[in-house]
C-alpha cells in the first residue's frame, strides 16, 4: 500500500474514495404512492417509453446543492435536470420534469418512475402528471434502491467522475461543473 501510494503521488494521481451514504429520500409522508409498474424492466426498447428520476446532493463550502435528473431509458440520456439549494418540489422534480418535456415532448404512453420521496408524491407534482393521460406513474418499493437502479447508477458515476474530483468553494462553481459534465460529456460522449 505504501509503495502504491508513493508511486501514485509521484505520478500526480489520487484515488477516488467512496463517501459515506446519506439518505435523502423522505418517504415518511401521507401522500398516495403508485405501485411499482416498472418492476426493474430497464430496457424499454424505445425512446420516450420510460423515464426514471431521482435526487442526490452535492456538497459545496456554501452549503448543499440538490441535483434532480430525469433519464430516458431508451438511450440512457439525462433529458431533464435541475439544481436547487432547497428540496422543494417546484425547484427539483417539477423543474427537471419540465426540462425533460421540452427536450422530448410526450407523444406516447410514458411510464414515469421515481423513488417514494415526498417531492415525487406531493400534490403539486402528482397533479401535474395526472393532467396528461399518457403518463403512468410508478414508484419504487419502500427502501429499495434497486428499483431505481439506473438513476442511482448515474449518480454514482457522476460523483466518481466529476463531483469527488473537486472541492467546490461555491454553488455556482458546482453548478457549472455539473452542467459541463451532463451536457458536454455524459450525454454526448460518455455513454
Residues of each region from the PLM?
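Charged DNA-binding/catalytic regions of mobile-element recombinases
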Residues: 1-191
Amino acid at each position: 500500500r505504501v509503495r502504491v501510494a508513493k508511486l501514485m503521488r509521484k505520478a500526480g494521481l489520487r484515488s477516488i474514495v467512496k463517501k459515506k451514504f446519506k439518505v435523502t429520500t423522505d418517504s415518511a409522508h401521507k401522500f398516495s404512492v403508485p405501485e411499482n409498474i416498472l418492476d426493474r424492466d430497464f430496457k424499454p426498447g424505445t425512446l420516450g417509453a420510460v423515464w426514471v428520476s431521482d435526487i442526490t446532493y452535492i456538497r459545496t463550502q456554501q452549503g448543499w446543492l440538490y441535483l434532480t435528473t430525469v433519464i430516458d431509458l431508451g438511450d440512457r440520456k439525462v433529458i431533464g435536470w435541475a439544481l436547487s439549494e432547497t428540496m422543494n418540489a417546484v425547484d427539483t422534480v417539477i423543474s427537471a420534469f419540465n426540462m425533460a418535456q421540452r427536450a422530448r415532448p410526450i407523444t406516447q404512453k410514458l411510464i414515469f418512475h421515481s423513488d417514494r420521496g415526498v417531492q415525487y408524491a406531493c400534490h403539486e407534482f402528482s397533479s401535474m402528471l395526472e393532467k396528461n393521460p399518457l403518463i403512468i406513474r410508478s414508484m419504487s418499493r419502500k427502501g429499495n434502491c434497486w428499483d431505481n437502479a439506473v438513476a442511482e447508477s448515474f449518480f454514482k458515476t457522476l460523483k466518481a467522475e466529476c463531483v469527488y474530483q473537486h472541492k467546490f468553494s461555491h454553488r455556482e462553481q458546482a453548478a457549472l461543473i455539473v452542467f459541463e459534465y451532463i451536457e458536454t460529456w455524459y450525454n454526448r460522449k460518455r455513454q
